């Protein structure tokens, strides 16, 4: 069977209704993306962890429906638009989807990733490239964080250089758990990973089991009281600014904090918010993204 992708862009208020209608009318799958992704207009969908998101699509959304090539896309989209209550049928484009061995193709796109001095992120279908490597076995999945994104890489390099044996670590916005797992493999003591997304929490638990890393995961309400030697948060600049007081309060006096998910042009603004609580500066920049690192002052 051959397939095509039907791609339409439309405002946020119509994206979810159109997606539901497309599925009801026979689309094989539907996804919604930020049409402004990787541009200055890109918007985070979620706000502060622990809060229920106020919206379920982006201001400028791209709806992508996978359809049978034998199906008339114009008829399908017109029917879906009518079902969703749209005043008119949105313009669309079609993309051909080639027949593929999807498992083999996916595996071929994820080779081992070398990070820092000794870290290797290795998919389960690969062997460790070096006998003395610090190996994290991680497959692509639902949760963010496989080591390929510059922000994840920056945080991993920072942790490799920073974590000392027995230190306590909080990974806030843990995604796949990659940073928490790395901290444990670097010799940390108690490690906690927190994420707003229950699917991410479950994925992180599974990844930790696979890597034999004893890490405690939970939702924001599960975050333990007390302070940590190290806090790392790889999120986005706006949530980081909102959570500055809370995140820095989790750092022991003299403890370390690292923040990423921050574009280089956003670094000064984020740093100025955190400077009220910690001595902080850009630690390293990579491909337009930065990792900010700081130390909590003795008096908070």
UniProtKB/Swiss-Prot annotation:
Compartments it resides in: Cytoplasm
GO MF assignments: protein-lysine N-methyltransferase activity
InterPro entries: Ribosomal_L11_MeTrfase_PrmA (IPR050078), Ribosomal_PrmA_MeTrfase (IPR004498), SAM-dependent_MTases_sf (IPR029063)
A Pfam short name: PrmA
Tagged with keyword Lipid biosynthesis: no
Protein's UniProt name: Ribosomal protein L11 methyltransferase
Matches recorded under CDD domains: AdoMet_MTases
Binding annotation for S-adenosyl-L-methionine: 152, 173, 195, 234
Annotated GO CC locations: cytosol
Protein family per UniProt: Belongs to the methyltransferase superfamily. PrmA family.
Alphabetical keyword list: Cytoplasm, Methyltransferase, S-adenosyl-L-methionine, Transferase
E.C. no: 2.1.1.-
Matching PANTHER family: ELECTRON TRANSFER FLAVOPROTEIN BETA SUBUNIT LYSINE METHYLTRANSFERASE (PTHR43648:SF1)
Function recorded in the entry: Methylates ribosomal protein L11.
GO biological process: methylation
Catalytic function, reaction form: L-lysyl-[protein] + 3 S-adenosyl-L-methionine = N(6),N(6),N(6)-trimethyl-L-lysyl-[protein] + 3 S-adenosyl-L-homocysteine + 3 H(+)
